[in-house]
Amino acid sequence: MRTSTPSSTMTKSGSAPPALRARSLSKSYRSPVLDNLDLDIEQGQFVAIMGPSGSGKSTLLHCLSGMDRPSGGSVLLGDTEITSLSEKELAALRLTHFGFVFQQAHLMPTLCLLDNIVLPGYLAGLRPRPEITARGRRLMERMGISEQAASGVTEVSGGQLQRAGICRALINDPGIVFADEPTGALNSATALQILDLLGQVHASGTTLVMVTHDARVAARADRVLVLVDGCIAEDLALGEYEEARAAQRLSAVSEALQRRSV
């Protein structure tokens, strides 16, 4: 059973509130990276984040997911303002409510694939260990890597490592999965397979927030945010577009915005 959102409530109409809300979200390092963003992400939505290099894509994902703290503003998960949580509370929330898929899986080299996958489940302590292990095996079967359960990290391909990374992200049945360029280090054929698997994750009801530079990847999303200079320059709903037409539209928008930002 999916872990419930902290302090989540239903609206008066009976519909669920947004999965994530950002209000006046800002982030600065030596200079501003995110500039006073407001954003609602609905439950079950697949949101892709695009934009030129340095536009704030990964920073936005990190602030939304609690991996980095904003310089100003707030992020709410249900009714819980995660930006006000302590580091310990935030770490527990990330472990139990969020899943993460990165460009590189970053698995522990001393553990086999199955042990890497179930470790976050053991740490969360939400279920008995035998149940967590059984879930890990089911996820590996679902991702097509069940035969590699006992294999070491150096004994499998990059695509198999990324599949294991997806399994690890799902071990605690998170409500939201954050993905940062999950296909960026893969060849075209393997990248398509990984996208199909992430599409299945989204189809099961999981909210998916993905950073990508590739219009063909973003074209699979329900909604695409295009960032320029830390601001949302475009917020596109793609539901009415076929995937090929969506990719063409996104490519045109992205190219125009990149020219504008130069």
Name each region found by the language model.
Residues 50-52:
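The feature captures the beta-strand-to-loop junction immediately N-terminal to the Walker
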Residues 65:
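Helix-to-loop junction immediately C-terminal to a conserved catalytic motif
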Residues 73-81:
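Conserved ABC transporter NBD signature motif
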Residues 95, 151-154, 172, 204:
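Conserved signature/switch motifs of ABC ATPase nucleotide-binding domains
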Residues 111-120:
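Short coil-to-helix segment of the ABC ATPase nucleotide-binding domain corresponding to the Q-loop/switch region
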Residues 152-156, 160-162:
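Conserved ABC ATPase signature
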Residues 177-180:
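Catalytic Walker B motif of ABC-type/P-loop ATPase nucleotide-binding domains
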